[in-house]
């Protein structure tokens, strides 16, 4: 990872398009972390230095195409309003560029002389982070930064914090003194972080700086700065600034959107047509398409007018805006994507009907699924090959993406781009669908409705507390159907982690649940093009799936934390769980779509006082 220098020559030698000098390499991270952990706008610590990952405005110059190839997922791109996606660059040691970073925070302290000031006042040599007055002692970046819920980021206002009652003669921070930071060592709390100034003001500690209104009470407002965007002007902002630890997860949280590649977009043809799609879409007749294809794909018989017409028809049929309007705006575009995937997972897509480039292979098992009828499970589907694209749409600060509206999402670039950074992963999985008539009958039980209503109320309260404006807070998706399917997916992943050879962290859930959907996909997905070796698909054969379900449900009847767990009125973050804990139903966070909330194993197996709330109670008592 490399920071952009203040002045960079774009002159070239001969025919080479590369700069004369390679930029200094600051460190490296895994490619997937550029989407999930160290994406645009995040802070990354490298040795004794700290940087913010730059925006993608200049990525067309710094991300080489051979290191950061273009990938396509038509359905997701259309919803996100872009043409394509790009993988973060996988740079070699000889690469002259890559993901750019910028130094942040700019305030540093010297552990030797305890001086606290802007890094430029230390006068360090170029590309070094040292105190020249202390024999090149490495400087320490500020532990504290300031952020707001609109995504702005700034240095902590140390001068204003220290001179809170003595700012008449130095309101702009020019009191003539030299600030310093020291640690008293009396405790590990903020009370031990002492700020002082040679101008004579009383020294203060950092205690209280993390209060929600601590900076607002001092008259400090958000300056609207976006240091990850080169040349970005400050924005007017009404949000209250908040103090955060530089390494806190609240400083940066990704807004990720994903989609599976499904027919007719999954056979490689859509990728070939991507550069020509806008032109093809403008044609009104088959003859125009045929003439264009003869010129654009001369000698390539795989691209036919019939195939293009099929894709054009599919695009119109799958238009999220069209379906949302049909449902009176009640369905989000992302839910439309899920419905399309659900329909394809239910219908299947056999390998024998497709070529080697097909990225979605979904077939029913060969054996009779009658053994699953007592569980209320419809015919499972074996997803022998899948491709998922996960795109970084934006990011949030302080409030998580779940409880934030789009108005609080921070952009990845100063000007809109026609692409977003993304990862593509390949894998396999098993799709499980429950009988909807059984679900509807079970969900009508007053006891079931009461348990879920309490969970939903707690989740709604949590979302409103986290939201800047409670009126804009999203509504909890908790329903009996969702909580049941979510908890079942969790216990089944835990069971398969013991039987399929994959750790729970290597498996993921993808839930399909609303009034018309009742299923989930458990899959393994890796960045390797080969995906995995069939161990998960084998678990979807009816006999093995029945055994796994029975074993998982038996395990769910007892938890090492019982009776506290099963009798808990509420548990988890914000009380958004009921009978669920790390000993029975929770998973690694990377495996769960809802961050380990909206879980209740009592809906699977019942409680000692009321077994009837369990959907699978008859299987367990048989």
Kindly give the residue locations of the regions a language model identified.
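Extended charged low-complexity segments that act as oligomerization/scaffolding linkers
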Residues: 183, 187, 193-196, 201-209
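Covalent nucleotidyltransferase core used to form phosphodiester bonds in nucleic acids
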Residues: 162-173
